[in-house]
């Protein structure tokens, strides 16, 4: 988080610790098939990219090129959106946008101690449950392993943080969660359940679109840094940093539960719930926008 203010130097190698512990835990539990190797190779590319950025400066263009290579590795290994009503020439570009978006979304919300890691843990928990419900044990184990690594990291990342994940960690967990969310089976009961991954990862997705919208209104570049994140606005309103972070955890948990619930509904019921959630998101964005960040 470039928007963080520190009174003391804090190490940025937490992301590398998450990556290594994730690899070790999987090596002890699973045998590696093509899809898993693709996910791990893509994650490794992202980690190298993040380390370079944490210890130097990468232009947005170079960073996007590196992320694109990682996404192409995933698609080549068979990790992409697979829905019967979407042809491959739509699925591949959509998968690319999804993975690039989620990878950067977790980097975008990393503006407070424990925020990105804790939200990512909640997302991992939801994906784990989806994997168990669908008897997809590889997905469940990978999500559980990632969640365990994040929980261990949170002990040292919660306010006041002793270590940060940096771009290395935020982009890595974004790539992992984007991949794992994409390969789950959500549409057993209704086609509208394909929205479940968006709900599971709803907090970083909401913040990304919210920040881009505010910057657009101000005539700024959407990739410019600015203190317009939902978490910073909540803190500006009246919450403390810890209260804001814990509230974000709660919202992420509720969205994960909503995703699991929507998977069990009939089609019409799912449509109604989605409309309600979209309305709540729009109203929340409107209220957050009204908070004056200039004072």
List where the protein language model places each region.
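Membrane-interface capping segments at transmembrane-helix boundaries
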Residues: 158, 283-295
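Small-residue-enriched core segments of transmembrane alpha-helices in multipass membrane transport
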Residues: 170-171, 201, 273-280
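Extended hydrophobic-aromatic, low-complexity segments
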Residues: 189-192, 212, 223-225, 243-244, ...
